[in-house]
Amino acid sequence: MLNVVILAAGLGKRMQSDLPKVLHSLAGKPMLEHVLDSASQLEPGRIVVVVGHGADRVRGAYEGRAGLSFALQQPQQGTGHAVQQAVPLLQEDGKDDVTLVLYGDVPLVQPDTLRRLLQARGQGAAVLTELLDDATGYGRIVRNEQGQVQRIVEHKDASEAERAIREVNTGILAAPTGRLKDWLSRIDNNNAQGEYYLTDVVGLAVADGVPVGAAQPSAGWETLGVNSRVQQAELERRWQQEQARRQLEAGVTLADPARFDVRGTLTCGRDVFIDVGCVFEGKVELADGVRVGPHCVLRDVSVGAGTHIDAYSHVQQATVGRDARIGPYARLRPGASLGDRTHVGNFVEIKNSVLDADSKANHLAYIGDADIGARVNVGAGTITCNYDGANKHRTIIEDDAFIGSDTQLVAPVRVGRGATLGAGTTLTRDAPAGQLTVSRARQTTIEGWQRPQKKS
């Protein structure tokens, strides 16, 4: 049975914020959520989050998440004391029970690294370590002449010889659950900080004859913690650099990898091109040959092969077919579904609407709550008037219709197949198929009329 304990009780004073530190965002989601997602991939029997400062807000953010429990650390008296608060919630079934300790402000540790750590422990304990050129402030890994881990000494408690050690403790640890409970009951706060150190369980394990293994992360950024806005920004950049590297290695062309942000997951086909300043949020899928112009924002979208999305377009919770042309300055809102070879041009907004294959809305239009068939032309300035002040109503435009410029369609209303609406029409009743419908006032010329002149 695998238990995961995530320490998330810290104040985060240097963040200069009322928001609990672990709820601050990294790559589009709270730091704690990154840790929860990585832990969940290990399929633990239970995850316990130890909360303290801002406990109610942290609980409120994740209370409904399956398999999650909370323990309160009050007051905060060190990492060992924090894990002690989780002890009553740890589960054991007698089958290789193990507890993994993670940190809510170390958000980017990867599941593969955690799997290696669990393997490294064998039947004993294991710590995740790292080699640093400058180890100032970190706990040092002290090994014996045979290279076996003996203990961890915190920087403030270390001798000069121990401070010369480059291998440091990341704080992440795995240990047999039953033995961990025993070791936690035996640690004390006889140290420079006056706190109960989780690291002391390593020395207790060695004293009890329990082997302590070690593993290293695949990349140094995995174990970087966040204690300030500066560190948050630095880690954000490191993570975005990693995202860019992965996309480049997968064959995506990035106009500038330094100006590229993924705040979720981005899946790309072959020969995708992404220009500068683009942001991808949630789950985004780009098929083969998609081109995304500069400064676009895509959130929870699927884009078909060969589609071009031009500059400054925003696409959210929408689907776009093959070989479509979107933008520049287009906005697709939730529920927009565009078919193959559709065109949505500058300053066109589409919400909760279907635009079937080969239909076009190239200029200055609002299409909301509409079902538009194939090969429809929507003229500039067209508006579907979908809201009556209380309820939304749908507009239906059948195949091959032509909607003239500056037209208002007052829903609920239907435009029949092949119908034409004259420019300036305000449509309040259904337009019959194959006919021209016009509702604007008749043009009049007043002969002899003179424009008023200013009085001198």
Swiss-Prot record:
Q: Name one Pfam family in it.
A: NTP_transf_3
One annotated Gene Ontology cellular component of this protein: membrane
| GO biological process assignments | cell morphogenesis; cell wall organization; lipid A biosynthetic process; peptidoglycan biosynthetic process; regulation of cell shape; UDP-N-acetylglucosamine biosynthetic process
User: Which reactions is this enzyme annotated as catalysing?
Assistant: alpha-D-glucosamine 1-phosphate + acetyl-CoA = N-acetyl-alpha-D-glucosamine 1-phosphate + CoA + H(+); N-acetyl-alpha-D-glucosamine 1-phosphate + UTP + H(+) = UDP-N-acetyl-alpha-D-glucosamine + diphosphate
**Any keyword DNA repair?**
no
Residue segments, region Pyrophosphorylase: 1-229
Reported EC number(s) for this entry are 2.7.7.23, 2.3.1.157
Task: Enumerate the UniProt keywords alphabetically.
Answer: Acyltransferase, Cell shape, Cell wall biogenesis/degradation, Cytoplasm, Magnesium, Metal-binding, Multifunctional enzyme, Nucleotidyltransferase, Peptidoglycan synthesis, Repeat, Transferase
- Which residues does the record give as Mg(2+) binding sites? D105, N227
- Binding positions for acetyl-CoA? A380, N386, Y387, S405, A423, R440
> Hey, which pathway is this one from?
Nucleotide-sugar biosynthesis; UDP-N-acetyl-alpha-D-glucosamine biosynthesis; N-acetyl-alpha-D-glucosamine 1-phosphate from alpha-D-glucosamine 6-phosphate (route II): step 2/2; Nucleotide-sugar biosynthesis; UDP-N-acetyl-alpha-D-glucosamine biosynthesis; UDP-N-acetyl-alpha-D-glucosamine from N-acetyl-alpha-D-glucosamine 1-phosphate: step 1/1; Bacterial outer membrane biogenesis; LPS lipid A biosynthesis
EC main group: transferase
What InterPro entries does the entry give?
Bifunctional_GlmU, GlmU-like, GlmU_C_LbH, Hexapep, Hexapep_transf_CS, MobA-like_NTP_Trfase, Nucleotide-diphossugar_trans, Trimer_LpxA-like_sf
Q: What does this protein do?
A: Catalyzes the last two sequential reactions in the de novo biosynthetic pathway for UDP-N-acetylglucosamine (UDP-GlcNAc). The C-terminal domain catalyzes the transfer of acetyl group from acetyl coenzyme A to glucosamine-1-phosphate (GlcN-1-P) to produce N-acetylglucosamine-1-phosphate (GlcNAc-1-P), which is converted into UDP-GlcNAc by the transfer of uridine 5-monophosphate (from uridine 5-triphosphate), a reaction catalyzed by the N-terminal domain.
Query: Could you identify this protein by its name?
Result: Bifunctional protein GlmU
Native source species = Bordetella petrii (strain ATCC BAA-461 / DSM 12804 / CCUG 43448)
